[in-house]
Amino acid sequence: MRWRLPGARTTLPASVALLLLPILVAPQQLQEHDDLPSTLSVPLSPTQRSFDHHPLPTINVKSNDASALATMALAGPGRAVRARPAQASSSSAGLAPQLHARSLQDWEVEDFVLLATVDGSIHARDRRTGAARWALEVPSSPMVESIYHRANRSSFDRAQPEDDFLWIVEPSQDGNLYIYSPGPDAGLQKLGLTVKELVEQTPYSGTDPAVTYTARKETTLYTVDARTGNILQVFSSRGPITSGHGCRKVDGFDLEAEECDTPSGTLVLGRVEYAVAIQNTETGDPICTLKYSEWTANNRDMDLQSQYFRTMDQSHIYSMHDGVVLGFDHSRMDRPRYTQRFSSPVVRVFDVARPINVESPEAATPLVLLSQPLQPPDPDYGSLDDRDARVFVDCTSAGGWFAMSEETYPLVTGRAKMAQCYEKDYLRHGQPLTSLPTSQQRDALAGVHSLNGPRVVRNTPSISGPSPLELANDTPRELMRSPSELALPPALRHSTIIRKGWDNAVDIFVTILLLFFGAFIYFNSHNIQELAKQKLDVKNIIASYAQPPLSTPSTPVVESTHFKRDSSPSRPISNLTVEVTVPEEQQEGDATPKPKRDRSAVGPDSTPRVKIREPSRGPDSDDDVEELDQAASPEKPKKKARRGRRGGKNHRRGKKPDSEGESKDQADRVVDQVNNLQPQSRLEPDLQLVRTVSNDIIEMDGVLQIGRLRVFSDVVLGHGSHGTVVYRGSFDGRDVAVKRMLVEFYDIASHEVGLLQESDDHNNVIRYFCREQAAGFLYIALELCPASLQDLIERPGDYPQLVQGGLDMPDILRQIIAGVRYLHSLKIVHRDLKPQNILVAMPRGRTGSRSLRLLISDFGLCKKLDDNQSSFRATTAHAAGTSGWRAPELLVDDDNRSAIQGGESQHTESSEPAVVDPQTNRRATRAIDIFSLGCVFYYVLTRGSHPFDKNGKFMREANIVKGNFNLDELQRLGDYAFEADDLIRSMLSLDPRKRLAPLCSSLAFRLFTDLFPRPDASAVLMHPFFWNPSDRLSFLCDVSDHFEFEPRDPPSDALLCLESVACRVMGPEMDFLRLLPKDFKDNLGKQRKYTGSKMLDLLRALRNKRNHYNDMPAHLKAHIGGLPEGYLNFWTVRFPSLLMSCHSVIVELRLTKIDRFKRYFTPVE
């Protein structure tokens, strides 16, 4: 029988490939060869069939993931395996007798772990500190050995194609195989085959290529004292072996004592040794011998291993290439708990588990080894593009080559160097790779390789093909060179470095130019800033005085000695035409103007005349317009200001005398145009704001003194949009953050300040202090915060004073939603909620609280809703917010909504009034903040991940539009995972206007559904995710009490609604009693009988045992845990959806207002 690769050739590289690769790859790739099975399949006996264990979540695990260091269970990602009882009349099939079903919940992790190293040793280390306990060095052979028999042949023998291959084994589960081959396409390749699979396919002998494979497999089992590491028993396929270790005497001074000390626990540890011999079929000469040994757990415990998807205490150990191991505790946001170094890299990690309930405490407890599951070290780790392609290769002291891939061992290549074989040519022409000494091979190959490349680039001489016009035979040789070689001086053509530099001369020149430009900007930044300030000052002065007045003004012309001031801070008027004469002195702020002097008596310049013209703004402006009517004559008093109306409706004015009718009609039209274009803006001509007075600001040693505000311009805290810079400052001795903005963005600053003044009376909204203007800038003083939420989540180590007591994630999210709820109560929609705009501050001293304060900040894009308005219009071209954090309704126009006339309201399917923009046919509500908060919540709970990063960060908005999010990382939260998933899923609802379908109308009810409406801030604050354990347990007991009084024969609609969620809560088995421990069920049945398929009985059992908790035996209470948290966890671990299912039933039945449940659905003020 021949195995061939498609399209094989008789060239040397093809021969090499035919020699080795087809044997390994063909069984997996070529399905047409049916005479040799590609895998060995053993049918399960009736007692070995598996079925689902409902409470544990399904997690997809790659088959070749070894773990953080070790591998996943051999049983794969299936759930708990329970042995089905065999028939009484027949014997059990398989290797093991019938076993009772075991649950991982009945086991606890020991305080030490076992680490297997490449040199073949087993080390017991402390789980929390990494301190050494004991080491097992039997046998002493390394895990990987590779013997190449080229060294046994004469140097005069002809080189064989197989001499150019190196076999490399990854000491993970079953031993993944790699090969390295030199040549033009040199590189590391993964065969997709393991040593175990190769052994199972032997014996095999072929003629094309003429290669024979034979193999053997030997197993040894050790029983070890878990406390001392002494080997108690040895079982081997080669026969009985004496352990060589005596037992520990009870009396250490009595050497003749016969009684031995009973070990507190025993470990069963297996070692499987594989050996594969590769020989030439024709000559019988040996080619290579591969030996691989791996440490394994007892296969009897595969039922527990198949349930072990995450460690019990969130502790993981990661291995580095140089023997260093890092111990992490993922439940805490800090750096590695400990670091230890071994003489050889650690390749397997086993957690040790002990049963909680021990029948005989005096006997030695059999402990179980569980291969530690894979856990990424960081949420962003899985997004690295080339993570799975990076492999570290090295060899043992005996010359055995081994590999450690980043896919199997996260962080292993972090500090390793790239292999030198891709940079230098270590082989002379025709020299086999295996003929080199081991030291030279290691110098060339040891290091990081990439499965996607790089490949060695050889400067192989070649003959260029003819050009469209065939070259004549007398074409000079120099003209046949490449352009880069032709331009290079002949003396430098053989220098690789110079030739590469010459080929990339343009890139190098541009890089150097940019570096010089960057250095120039850096060293002259202060001078550039000063020039920019001076230019702005000159621009303001010229704009105020140098522009000639137009013959026909576009806004009213006001003639008065002074103007009535508004209570709001004064604003600068840009692009104004001002003609000023000095009026008679009067006190600033006087509400009553003094009598004007007769113009003839005083002179033509005695009365100030101010002509104001402000450029129109776009239709998105929502500021009020204060109309200033022109005085008919100097003797007439100024008319009272009148506010404009939204929507651009014109005021109807009373008629004037005929002599003024024409001019007044023209003025009315001008005012109406201003109202339409610029609603809610104020025209407050203040002559002091037109010019910037140089002595308003005092600058000394990087400190600016502006009134009561001091700005430290050399301490920059951050940068924002519109040229905004945030400095450290002080206001009346209080440390503040000073936000500096250009005067051109005065409207934005005034808008932000107005909202801050209105909303800063809340613990979770940033506080506003003052505002100053000087030198062409506006300065806003705000509360100073040491970090933002993004800083706290992504770099907690930089803020030890904030995280010293740990982070209470639910409290952080509760404060954020409380601040947003307060803004929404004031009809303020933030529109730019993201981690950067949520600041973190220390608790205030007078409150006595130790929890951090979360503050909503950056109100530059906020919208204020008018009375009876619950939404506003936005366009996709001017959608507010930050990319990746915006709601889908801001990104997609609603084409299904009919066009509405501008300035009118409409009723949507949710019966909410909306303000319609005539330029678009779409609205947006407070729900856009809820969507952004859903992304922020996920970001906080997963420590930096984004729910829409499924295909990378650049696809966020595309995924948002499609509603394509992924919440799998929430499973790490444990008890709160289900509630967090439900809350965030509803907040990320694609369409906020959808309404929930009737809960009990469908038998196939799914708790996770996209029909949930996006909740408001109050509903988010009342979600069960924010309930404490006491409230959660009380709620479940109240649900049980309420439904006890429902009619049962026939059952009421409410009771049917409750029972409709039983399948979701209990799983397909529909029997909650099967998931409870035997001792608990025995104690439960003493009071009354329960039907396992009834939700009512499940809630009754939970309530009754809570009420009779003190009547339970001590050992049962220790197993369950204390009230309320331990007892609640006992139930929610087995029934994760119980709380949310009952919550949904109460909401659907509209029972939230009755006295029993009212307190759960009332937000705390």
From Swiss-Prot:
Skewed-composition ranges (Basic and acidic residues): 591-600, 611-620, 656-668
Domain Protein kinase, residue spans: 711-1026
Protein name stated in the entry: Serine/threonine-protein kinase/endoribonuclease ireA
Enzyme Commission number(s) of this protein: 2.7.11.1, 3.1.26.-
Cytoplasmic side: 526-1165
Location(s), subcellular: Membrane
Catalytically driven reaction(s): L-seryl-[protein] + ATP = O-phospho-L-seryl-[protein] + ADP + H(+); L-threonyl-[protein] + ATP = O-phospho-L-threonyl-[protein] + ADP + H(+)
Residues that carry a glycan: N152
Lumenal topological domain residue ranges: 28-504
Record note on disruption phenotype: Leads to avirulence in a mouse model of invasive aspergillosis. Results in severe defects in the expression of multiple virulence-related traits, including reduced thermotolerance, decreased nutritional versatility, impaired growth under hypoxia, altered cell wall and membrane composition, and increased susceptibility to azole antifungals.
PTM characteristics: Autophosphorylated mainly on serine residues.
Coiled coil: none
TM stretches of this protein: 505-525
SUPFAM superfamilies, per database record: Protein kinase-like (PK-like), Quinoprotein alcohol dehydrogenase-like
Recorded GO CC terms: IRE1-TRAF2-ASK1 complex
Record entry for activity regulation: 8-formyl-7-hydroxy-4-methylcoumarin inhibits the endonuclease activity and prebvent the splicing if the hacA mRNA. The kinase domain is activated by trans-autophosphorylation. Kinase activity is required for activation of the endoribonuclease domain.
Biased composition (Basic residues): 637-655
Species this protein is from: Aspergillus fumigatus (strain ATCC MYA-4609 / CBS 101355 / FGSC A1100 / Af293)
UniProt similarity note: Belongs to the protein kinase superfamily. Ser/Thr protein kinase family.
Residue span, KEN domain: 1029-1163
Cofactor entry: Mg(2+)
Domain of life: Eukaryota
Active site: D832 (proton acceptor)
